[in-house]
Amino acid sequence: MLDTKFDELMEFPASFPFKVVGDASDTLQDRVVAVVQGLAPGDYAPSTKASSKGTYYSVTIRVTVTSKEQIEKLYTQLAELEGVKRVL
């Protein structure tokens, strides 16, 4: 598990943005939403932007999180998605 200090810095529940950067893929946004739905079910409206050369996509999604552990699980599972380079 990650060693973060989210519990010291935040009050829960909280709205928390995740930005997932990965290889350009038409399915990246759907895969990000599927991971988020598995840990924090809700109605999400993520935004996707292509890099200047179109090589990468970034998907930004705002999630209502309820604990430090939930944030850590989201970071871990999003980072494990195929083609993902970074989770910010």
Curated annotation (Swiss-Prot):
UniProt cross-references to NCBIfam families, sorted A to Z: PRK04998.1
Similarity remark: Belongs to the UPF0250 family.
**SUPFAM superfamilies from the xrefs?**
YbeD/HP0495-like
| Organism of this sequence | Shewanella piezotolerans (strain WP3 / JCM 13877)
Query: What Pfam families does the database record attribute to this sequence?
Result: DUF493
Kindly provide the name given to this protein in its UniProt entry: UPF0250 protein swp_3927
A GO term from the CC aspect: cytosol
User: Organism's domain of life?
Assistant: Bacteria
- Signal sequence bounds: none
